[in-house]
Amino acid sequence: MKREYLEKNVYEACMERLHFIFEEFDNILVSFSGGKDSGLLLNLVLDYKKKYYPDKTIGVFHQDFEAQYTVTTEYIERTLERIKDEAEIYWVCLPMATRTALSSYEMYWYPWDDTKQELWVREMPDKEYVINLSLIHI
């Protein structure tokens, strides 16, 4: 693949892309893992929204896999609390099948498995925007 150099930097290209997204889409959802890349993208999107589209609603999705570094969880919680009044937050804590490399006997691990609460790595987050099985009424 041949490289093509442009007369703009990464930030300028990002602003162009955000302009296109905000103009063309009614619903904008940012997936936020708590890593540096998604954290930067989330802040760029929210800054752009404040400056150019203050009335536009942004959704922020975080899939919580239960077992992660404590500092990552703390960063996620701080960030979501900070932005909760300017975005719709979806902090998802559901037992979804996740491939595991830690077991020779099981291919999948189910974070937040409600049938194995005694094995949870940490407590379920307690925020109004957390989505978990307690919200599902069958």
Predicted regions and their residues:
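ATP-dependent adenylation/nucleotidyltransferase module used to activate substrates
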Residues: 1-136
